[in-house]
Each structure stands twice: as structure tokens, then as C-alpha cells.
């Protein structure tokens, strides 16, 4: 297919035009007085949102060159959202500001490579300043403040997230689901839960809800498939003598082994339940090892020189209680806390080392199952449109809160970026080249843009307020919700440091890419034939 090619100024201007259009659509959502964006969907009701990344994801432009620019900026929003869970609108505003100011300099003949070096230098100093300025958060109230701001100042969502995090811990699993009622509630699952149910309903101890409930339970954790009852007899006899129930977790239990277990359970000779091991392949083995450590048992594996026939009671895991239904198993653990902590540290190290997003997600799931249990936030709303919008906000707030716990918080409302710009004013740039100084200045000016937009969205002229913030003492800022000058930290107007830092770094990365672009190539779109098409006349047909 034929290609269309733009060079130099034409390429950069077209890309900037696309960036500007996406930025204009996203920036109106910034701040407590941010406006809504209405998005038409091909199927179902339109979506109303104030979530920057949701707006960005929906934008595709007709002009191919402009669309490339828009897609570059969309990448900033998505990457920031993936990394920190929030700050997508801030990143978008910063990226457009840096790109716009940078292109003015490139158009006047300044070397873009030098400008980019200056931008990178300023951003590195700014990111370090943000890290050092961060204040660690520890209390439930501080967590609620961060979550509320990320949820567009919805304090009820902030309180729910703080409550869930307080219960399951910062490494615990918190999931967001759609509720079947109008109310937003939290439900908890203590201990470890995984998605494997019993192999036979005849194991049920509660016939009303068809579930198994055991207290003070032995757990046999086996890596291999169990097919014959003969393999199990030695360990079954030992457990029967203790009069305690037994949960068997293995790759699979089938044939006469399963039949014999069901028969003994129905007759009441032995309280027993059998389930398949969670996961697949190497992950299954790792999860079985997790369960063994969680319950203080040993994984029965021939690799370790341990067979079913040789298992002793002290090698079985133990649990305060076990609950099994047709879909899930929950184990309330009694394992050694020190061993559990060491296992958690090992998994954290694996998370840091892996480059696969899928592996990282699965490792985080394992970590959460080990250390904190699971909290489920069930989001309720009156209409489906409101439900989807609210669920988006809860998910964003949850991610931002995790970022805040990880790296701490800084004053919000764009005031931290103003403070960083003032800090950059004090940096000695005498050794930088002229081009690098221009790049450095671009970052300083661009850092004001998020606050300008927040004030503008609130209906005020930003220049007066920006000047006052620069002359007032550190820590003060403009609360766009109440239209007052306040101490941002004391008033709970805070942002996760990771969100602010990631927004700036991702914005500068894409803007620098645009400044150093000399050529843009895209496919020429084929013109579609009109629906009524002109059909060729049959040569054999004469005129009427």
C-alpha cells in the first residue's frame, strides 16, 4: 500500500496538532472542579467520566498524522495509569506543554538534541526533588485522604479503601466488583483463598449450601496425581487415630482413591475432603509450596525424596479452619510467621526481577494470598452508567493509594510542581549549552501548567494565583474546591509522590521523542466507493 510522508516542520506540526486535540479533551477533567466528558458507545448507553485515561483511550482522529500524535500522548496517559494508577490528566497536560514550548524553539532553529538533553536534565533533578519531598503515610486517615482525592473527592470511596487496606494490609488483595445492590460495601475473605472446589459434592458437611467446613484440620499437600487408595492408606490411618478432619490437596485425585474417600466421608468413618491443586505447571508447584509454608506442612514430592507412604503426621499442614464449596477453598492458617515472612520476601524479590507483566500479576496474587487475605469492594449505583463511572473511580483510587503507601505523598493541587519549578530556579546551569538551557527553561515553565488548568477549570484566572503561590511560604496552595488558600498537607489535599513523579517523567519522554522527530510515515487511506456505486453498462444493452 502507498505511503504518505511528512518531513521536518510539517511532520512535527501535524503530530503536535493531534497531541493538542487529545490534550484539550482530557485536560477539562483535571482538579476538583474538573468537567465531565460524555463518550458515545457503539452499544449501550453513553459513558460519563472525569477519568483522564478513559477519555484518552476513546480518541482516534481521522487525519493519520494527527492521530499518530494523539496515540503518542495516549501512551503517556496509559503508561502513567499502569505505573501509578492516577495522574493521567496531569501527565497529558505536562506532555503537551513541554512539546508545545519545545517545538517553538525547534522552529526558531535551535538544535532539538540539545533541547532534549536540557529537558532530561531538568526532569531528573525534578524527580529526585519529588522523591525527597515525599512524606510517608501510615494512618488510616491519611490513606482515606489520598483515596478520596483520586476518586474525584468522593470521601465515601476513600473511607472504604482505607478500611479495606487497614484490614488486609498494604500487600493484601483488594479487588473491585460490581454490586447487585445500590450500596457500596466491603466483604472480606480471611486467610488464603484459591479457585478450586471439592472434587465431589458428597464431601459436603452442610447440605443446605453444599459446603465443607472443618475446624482444627490436617492438610496433606501432594504434588502428584493420586489414583489408588493403597497410596493413601498409611496417612489415612494416622489421621483417623487423631479424630481430626483431613483436607487433601493434590494434582488430581481419581479412580478408586476418590471413590474410597467419598465412601468413608458418607459413612462418617473419616472427615475428609479432596481438591485439585491451584494453578498450572511451575506455578502450581510454587503455590503448593506457599500452602505448605502457610500451614506449617511439607510438600510431598518425590523430588524431595518424600512419598505418600512415608508421610508422618508432623509433615502434614494444619489449619484453624477450612471452608470448601464447589468453586473455592479458604484456609485459615496456623503456620510459622517467620517462615511466612521469609517466603513473602522471596516472592517480592521475584516480582522486582521479572519483566513479564503476566508473571508479575501472578506473583502479586501469590504474595497477597500469603500475607493478608482478600477484601472485595462491591461498588453499587442507581444506574448502569453511574455504576461503570464509579467503578472506574474506585479502581483509580485504589491504585493511587497503593502508590502513596509505596513512595509517600506530596502536597497536591499542582503545588508540588510549582515548588519543584522554584527549586529548578536555584540550580546552577552555567555549564549547560545554550540549547540545553532552553530545554531546562521549558520544563520550568511547563511545571506550572497543571495548576493553571486546575484553577481555570474552577472558573478563575490562573496567573494571579500562580504568582501568589510563588511568593507565599512553602506548603500553601489554592484549594479549588473551597476557593481558599490553605496548607495543602494539613487540609488533606495530597498526591502520591509516585503519581506526580511518573506523570512528569512519562510526559517528558514522549515530548522529547516528538522534538527529535524528522519524518512521519503513514498509509494513504483508500477512498471508499459510494453506496449507490455506478455499475458498468452491459455492452450488449442499447439505449432505451
UniProtKB/Swiss-Prot annotation:
Q: Which SUPFAM superfamilies match?
A: GroEL apical domain-like, GroEL equatorial domain-like, GroEL-intermediate domain like
- Reactions that this protein is recorded to catalyse: ATP + H2O + a folded polypeptide = ADP + phosphate + an unfolded polypeptide
| GO terms for MF | ATP binding; ATP-dependent protein folding chaperone; isomerase activity; unfolded protein binding
**Source superkingdom:** Bacteria
Q: Where is the signal peptide?
A: none
Instruction: Give the residues annotated as coiled coil.
Output: none
Please give the GO cellular component terms listed in this UniProt entry. Answer: cytoplasm
Q: Which PANTHER family match?
A: 60 KDA HEAT SHOCK PROTEIN, MITOCHONDRIAL
Quaternary data: Forms a cylinder of 14 subunits composed of two heptameric rings stacked back-to-back. Interacts with the co-chaperonin GroES.
What's the stated role of this polypeptide? Together with its co-chaperonin GroES, plays an essential role in assisting protein folding. The GroEL-GroES system forms a nano-cage that allows encapsulation of the non-native substrate proteins and provides a physical environment optimized to promote and accelerate protein folding.
Q: What is this protein called?
A: Chaperonin GroEL
Q: Which gene carries the instructions for this protein?
A: groEL
Amino acid at each position: 500500500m502507498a505511503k504518505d510522508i511528512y518531513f521536518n516542520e510539517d511532520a512535527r506540526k501535524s503530530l503536535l496538532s493531534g497531541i493538542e486535540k487529545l490534550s484539550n479533551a482530557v485536560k477539562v477533567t483535571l482538579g476538583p472542579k474538573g468537567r465531565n466528558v460524555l463518550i458515545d458507545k457503539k452499544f449501550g448507553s453513553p459513558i460519563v467520566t472525569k477519568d483522564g485515561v478513559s477519555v484518552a483511550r476513546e480518541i482516534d482522529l481521522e487525519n493519520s498524522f494527527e492521530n499518530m500524535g494523539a496515540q503518542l500522548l495516549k501512551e503517556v496517559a496509559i503508561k502513567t495509569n499502569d505505573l501509578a494508577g492516577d495522574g493521567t490528566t496531569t501527565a497529558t497536560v505536562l506532555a503537551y506543554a513541554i512539546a508545545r514550548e519545545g517545538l517553538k524553539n525547534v522552529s526558531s532553529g535551535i538544535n532539538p538534541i540539545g533541547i532534549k538533553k536540557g529537558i532530561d536534565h531538568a526532569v531528573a533533578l525534578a524527580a529526585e526533588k519529588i522523591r525527597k519531598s515525599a512524606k510517608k503515610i501510615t494512618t488510616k486517615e491519611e490513606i482515606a485522604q489520598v483515596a478520596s482525592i483520586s476518586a474525584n473527592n468522593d470521601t465515601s470511596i476513600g473511607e472504604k479503601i482505607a478500611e479495606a487496606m487497614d484490614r488486609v494490609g498494604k500487600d493484601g488483595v483488594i479487588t473491585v466488583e460490581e454490586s447487585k445492590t445500590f450500596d457500596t460495601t466491603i466483604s472480606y475473605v480471611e486467610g488464603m483463598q484459591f479457585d478450586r472446589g471439592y472434587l465431589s459434592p458428597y464431601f459436603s458437611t452442610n447440605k443446605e449450601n453444599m459446603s465443607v467446613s472443618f475446624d482444627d484440620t490436617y492438610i496433606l499437600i501432594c504434588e502428584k496425581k493420586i489414583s489408588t487408595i493403597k497410596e493413601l492408606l498409611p496417612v489415612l490411618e494416622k489421621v483417623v487415630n487423631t479424630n481430626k478432619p483431613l483436607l487433601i490437596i493434590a494434582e488430581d485425585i481419581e479412580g478408586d482413591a476418590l471413590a474410597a474417600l467419598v465412601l468413608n466421608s458418607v459413612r462418617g468413618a473419616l472427615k475428609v475432603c479432596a481438591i485439585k491443586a491451584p494453578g498450572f505447571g511451575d506455578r502450581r508447584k510454587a503455590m503448593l509450596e506457599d500452602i505448605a509454608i502457610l500451614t506449617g506442612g511439607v510438600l510431598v514430592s518425590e523430588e524431595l525424596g518424600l512419598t505418600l507412604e512415608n508421610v508422618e503426621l508432623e509433615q502434614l499442614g494444619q489449619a484453624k479452619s477450612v471452608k470448601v464449596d464447589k468453586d473455592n477453598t479458604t484456609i485459615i492458617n496456623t503456620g510459622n510467621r517467620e517462615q511466612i515472612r521469609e517466603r513473602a520476601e522471596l516472592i517480592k524479590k521475584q516480582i522486582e526481577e521479572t519483566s513479564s507483566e503476566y508473571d508479575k500479576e501472578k506473583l502479586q496474587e501469590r504474595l497477597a494470598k500469603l500475607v493478608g487475605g482478600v477484601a472485595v469492594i462491591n461498588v453499587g449505583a442507581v444506574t448502569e452508567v453511574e455504576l461503570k463511572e464509579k467503578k472506574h473511580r474506585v479502581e483509580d483510587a485504589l491504585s493511587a493509594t497503593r502508590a502513596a503507601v509505596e513512595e509517600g505523598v506530596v502536597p497536591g493541587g499542582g503545588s508540588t510542581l510549582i515548588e519543584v519549578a522554584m527549586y529548578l530556579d536555584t540550580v546552577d546551569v552555567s555549564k549547560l549549552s545554550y540549547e540545553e538551557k532552553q530545554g531546562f527553561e521549558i520544563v520550568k515553565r511547563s511545571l506550572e501548567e497543571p495548576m493553571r488548568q486546575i484553577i481555570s477549570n474552577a472558573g478563575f484566572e490562573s496567573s494571579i494565583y500562580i504568582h501568589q503561590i510563588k511568593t507565599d511560604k512553602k506548603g500553601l496552595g489554592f484549594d479549588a474546591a473551597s476557593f481558599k488558600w490553605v496548607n495543602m498537607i494539613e487540609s488533606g489535599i495530597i498526591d502520591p509522590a509516585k503519581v506526580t513523579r511518573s506523570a512528569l517523567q512519562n510526559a517528558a519522554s514522549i515530548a522529547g521523542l516528538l522534538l527529535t522527530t524528522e519524518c512521519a510515515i503513514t498509509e494513504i487511506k483508500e477512498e471508499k466507493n459510494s453506496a449507490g456505486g455506478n455499475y458498468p453498462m452491459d455492452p450488449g444493452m442499447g439505449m432505451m
